[in-house]
Amino acid sequence: PLALAPSEVYDDFQKGGCFSGSAIEHDGKLYLVYTGTTNYGDGFIQSQCLAYSEDGVHFEKYENNPIIPHPPEGYDESNFRDPKVWKHGDYFYLVCGSKKNNLASALLYRSKDLKNWEFFNVLAESRGEFGYMWECPDFYEIGDKHVLMFSPMGINERTSVYLVGDMNYDTGKFTYTNVGQIDYGFD
């Protein structure tokens, strides 16, 4: 069966849709966090939404979607997408791509219950060298380091970038010291 399809005002099929996201298990349920996209004629509006499943096959959209209706002030709501969710300590964290003043950002949110989210900090941002938008960000730990990986828009086509550094969960800030490309696109 189809797990997720556009059906609501916040992920309207005719003018937007369900964009990518991620999943996490919590209390015996599988939770999907995804981007709902709609367009009422004046550009895309993107928000972060939640669906859940008891069996991992049949999903129900959360009745109070969107769980994050807008990015923080000054960020582009038509470029606010692709949430990655994980748990650390007592909080769930979510990173999604956005942009402000034509520079890419990875925005960090946190929640105690996956339903009520607060903006925590800008996890990392471009200073101009990594394009104007970061799509499909991923954030994970390897050993004692953290990695932020994304697909930048506005630089070399078909490139994926990774940043390696240290995460401070008290401040919500990621400080990277190493940068690299995952691949160089198609041959």
Which residue ranges define each predicted feature?
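Beta-rich carbohydrate-recognition and catalytic domains
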Residues: 1-82, 86-130, 134, 141-186
